[in-house]
From Swiss-Prot:
Keyword Cytoplasm in record: no
Name recorded for this polypeptide: Manganese-binding lipoprotein MntA
Gene deletion effect: Null mutant is very sensitive to manganese.
Subcellular location: Cell membrane; Membrane raft
Function description: Probably part of ATP-binding cassette (ABC) transport system MntABCD involved in manganese import. Binds manganese and delivers it to the membrane permease for translocation into the cytoplasm.
A Gene Ontology BP annotation from the UniProt entry: metal ion transport
Family membership noted in the UniProt record: Belongs to the bacterial solute-binding protein 9 family.
Gene: mntA
GO molecular function terms attached to this record: metal ion binding
Taxon lineage: Bacteria, Bacillati, Bacillota, Bacilli, Bacillales
Organism listed in the record: Bacillus subtilis (strain 168)
Induction per the UniProt record: Repressed by MntR in the presence of manganese.
Positions of N-palmitoyl cysteine lipidation: C19
CDD domains documented for this protein: TroA (cd01016)
Amino acid sequence: MRQGLMAAVLFATFALTGCGTDSAGKSADQQLQVTATTSQIADAAENIGGKHVKVTSLMGPGVDPHLYKASQGDTKKLMSADVVLYSGLHLEGKMEDVLQKIGEQKQSAAVAEAIPKNKLIPAGEGKTFDPHVWFSIPLWIYAVDEIEAQFSKAMPQHADAFRKNAKEYKEDLQYLDKWSRKEIAHIPEKSRVLVTAHDAFAYFGNEYGFKVKGLQGLSTDSDYGLRDVQELVDLLTEKQIKAVFVESSVSEKSINAVVEGAKEKGHTVTIGGQLYSDAMGEKGTKEGTYEGMFRHNINTITKALK
């Protein structure tokens, strides 16, 4: 409620002051101003838009999108953009009021919601879906296509360039997908169990043949208890799994509890490394790109489990 009230006040202020841009009125040499919520979306937008777009990402390294709340500065960035790109599927759960109001006033798109519903993983008993779609490269390509469509709509004079850039980016992603499958083939099938702090890797598991278990649910906003820890400990002991993984955007406390629980049962489990789940690495590093993040995760998982 508080977040929604703040958004309403800010939007009213921007409406009175005329803040905002008109992408349709841009000249050929002007850049499209794009604001993306997550770094995964921002990376795709930069690759597709090339020199014709300027992309601002709200969430940086180590930021949890499930818990993220838009600041006044974020709202200004959203309102001053020509195009707003966000994931949707309730990933940005604390920002839904803000994003809904943005959509009433300017061009915006929930890029993950471009994926056909029959390809999504249902979440619980409701009508919601697992939002962590970027861990399936074939599914993430639907989001890439949606970004290209939004850019072409905003700047039709550069549609050919956006189409060409998107084609090249998708070819890179398809190569990354093939490489990932080749690397994972080195892990024995019985060892393909991926245990992490929260349930962010279900699409990854479906795509690459892993049994995936997270201590918390789909959102880090959900809690976990002693029973959840014990169930994971029992699984690790039964399957003789030797490694679990921490996440860059989630506290290590929960996974450390699992490691200690296994130790008490006489089974040694190590921390296999840190995976990038809801956020990518620092901008300017390999892990700060979608490809670099994905390669890091594959290399870390393969090294720990093979």
